[in-house]
Amino acid sequence: MVSPREVPRPDAAPRADGPSLVAVGIDGSDTAWRALAWACGHARRAGCPVLAVYVSTSGYRDRVVPGTDATAAATTAADAAAQLLRTEVEQTAAGFGMRVGFVHRHGDPARELVTAAREHGADLLVVGTSAQLLHRVAGSLPGKLARCREMPLVVVP
């Protein structure tokens, strides 16, 4: 029998005691605000920053012809919505005594959340649960993120 002291152990990661950056998906829904609150509280206790990631889906932009006024209007509307959301995110984080970075991406939410988190060096991703029935049937964002296994994932109800 091998004693626990004789079992080889992998070297600990440089920051194995907690996250160095917490990324949180934000879309303005109630569950996303709860996820932001959880992420801010966790990051404050861990002594690390928070990165809020907003992904505007491209569905409505794909229905217009590139280079037209409609494409420009759709992009402008998405950017304006992101700016309003950024202001609310910063105010919410300030209530927790935290400053938060903000990234606006376009595309598939699961793919863009993971890509943004990876690009910024996040080692924890926080999202809210899906509130829409269609997401429960067709596949929720948290479910897709859990299957990708890029980093630890917290799903806040």
Which positions does each model-derived feature cover?
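Structural beta-alpha unit
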Residues: 1-18, 91-125, 132
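Small/aliphatic-rich secondary-structure junction motif
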Residues: 11-67
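Short glycine/serine/threonine/alanine-rich loop segments
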Residues: 46-49, 98, 122, 151
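General small-molecule cofactor/ligand-binding pocket signal
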Residues: 51-53, 101-105, 154-156
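Short, hinge-like loop/turn segments at secondary-structure boundaries
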Residues: 67-71, 119-121, 143-144
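A short acidic, glycine-rich active-site loop
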Residues: 70-84
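Glycine-rich, Arg-bearing micro-motifs that act as flexible, cationic patches
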Residues: 124-148
